[in-house]
A protein has these predicted regions:
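A compositional signature for long Ser/Thr(±Pro)-rich, low-complexity
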Residues: 1-284
Length: 284
């Protein structure tokens, strides 16, 4: 069913994590050729010659047009600028090339950011030292999700679309930059954990905007890919200190290793996302 088809995962590093999982599964059958990458290897495309199947990951962490001042390690040199009324041409210009897409937003919207509309700054999130209108991240997130889904449902090109919901992290006793960790070794049981307020706020926006878009989608190309609850129950599935190989090798004993309690180990819980995605495709 995927012969001569193309599929793209559009979004942030969770989308990249997801496509890495799918690559691990697919390469057990056929080894692909890497046919494209951007300068930073964040957007990439692979081609499976026997299946004539093309798989891409498109780096667009805000889904909106933005200017980001970060190096490869995620260290920011300035505050990012988001244009809330313009989608990111990085994915919009390539949308017509894809038969299937998975798209979603996430934790990048928590970052301090300047917000623009009509090329004019309208406010800022999390920058009290600036003499600007204070806007919550939910303002930008709703704009991004609303514009993204409207573009997809109104486009003449009808890519079958999985709209992925947000993924909660499992940092405990701090955040990624304040000593938070994730050392649990078993999943949570049902009812043992609940979403925190910021994740609930994101999820509310996602479900509301998806419902509006689905109601206007006459071609029925849009599907909700709800990974939030699945992710919430798996605090045991993160790389922790092993986001890079040999994290403790040659390290100063007094220097802490940064932990990753957001992304997923491979193999790991994220592999189930691909099982669910394939099941949804087969039942269409």
């Amino acid at each position: 069913m995927m012969k001569n088809k193309s599929m793209a995962f559009i979004g942030d590093s969770i989308s990249r994590n997801h496509v890495q999982s799918l690559l691990c599964i697919l390469t057990q059958v056929e080894k692909p050729t890497n046919v494209y990458h951007d300068k930073e290897y964040k957007s990439r495309t692979w081609y499976f010659p026997l299946s004539e199947f093309t798989l891409s990951v498109v780096w667009s962490p805000f889904l909106l047009k933005s200017t980001i001042f970060e190096n490869q390690d995620g260290v920011a040199s300035d505050i990012p600028k988001l244009h809330l009324d313009e989608l990111d041409p990085v994915w919009v210009d390539r949308y017509k090339d894809f038969d299937y897409i998975e798209i979603g937003g996430g934790k990048w919207f928590f970052k301090t950011a300047f917000y623009y509309e009509n090329d004019t700054i309208v406010g800022c999130h999390n920058c009290p030292q600036k003499n600007l209108t204070k806007l919550d991240f939910t303002y930008a997130y709703r704009k991004a999700i609303q514009s993204t889904l409207k573009f997809i449902t109104s486009s003449k090109h009808k890519a079958f679309t999985f709209f992925r919901t947000c993924t909660p992290d499992h940092f405990e006793n701090g955040e990624w930059n304040t000593g938070g960790y994730c050392n649990r070794t078993v999943p949570y049981k049902e009812g043992e954990v609940e979403l925190i307020d910021v994740d609930l706020a994101m999820r509310k926006i996602e479900l509301e905007e998806f419902a509006k878009a689905a109601a206007s989608d006459q071609s029925s190309v849009l599907r909700l890919f709800d990974t939030t609850h699945l992710s919430l129950l798996r605090p045991d599935g993160h790389p922790g200190p092993y986001r890079r190989p040999h994290p403790f090798s040659g390290k100063d004993k007094n220097k802490k290793v940064q932990l990753d309690c957001l992304h997923w180990c491979l193999p790991g819980p994220i592999d189930a996302w691909n099982d669910l995605m394939m099941d949804m495709l087969l039942h269409e």
